[in-house]
Design a protein with these regions (language model features):
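Short, solvent-exposed coil/turn segments at beta-strand boundaries
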Residues: 26-32, 94
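Primarily extracytoplasmic ectodomains and periplasmic/lumenal surface modules that are beta-strand-rich
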Residues: 32-33, 70
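Short, solvent-exposed loop/hinge segments that bridge or flank secondary-structure elements
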Residues: 18-28
Length: 127
């Protein structure tokens, strides 16, 4: 669990080779923003949405993060290098910044609760 830290920002997304598509989800203590685009089709995002985050949502996200576990992960795949897809998660605040990149759809046991929340939010914004 992360202690309540208003400077914490969680970013996640996916990117696929051949301009097939990419998205990003940016979560802070006040806002959730989602952008999805298919670079091969247009420079204009197909989806660009944002909404305020509730205190309950923010607390659930903070409770889903074991920061020590996350900081110890060293995933750095490059499926996009061979026209595949990669997923990424970055966590940053005033004191730390760490990012992992892994094969799209892979569940990592030590961060699965966070991955589940990110997946739910992504589904909400894509519909």
């Amino acid at each position: 669990m992360v202690k309540d830290n208003n400077s914490l920002v969680i970013k996640s997304g996916f990117m696929c080779g051949w301009g097939a598509g990419q998205d990003s989800l940016i979560i802070s203590s006040t806002m959730i923003k989602y952008v999805y685009s298919v670079p091969a089709n247009s420079q204009i995002p197909e989806i660009n949405k944002a909404r305020p985050i509730t205190d309950t949502e923010w607390n659930n996200i903070l409770n889903s993060i074991n920061l020590n576990n996350f900081l110890n992960l060293n995933y750095n795949s490059c499926n996009i290098c061979v026209d595949g897809c990669d997923e990424w998660i970055a966590i940053k605040n005033d004191a730390i910044s760490h990012q992992i990149r892994f094969g799209m759809g892979i569940k990592i046991d030590s961060i699965k609760p966070l991955q589940d929340i990110l997946s739910q939010l992504r589904s909400e914004f894509r519909n």
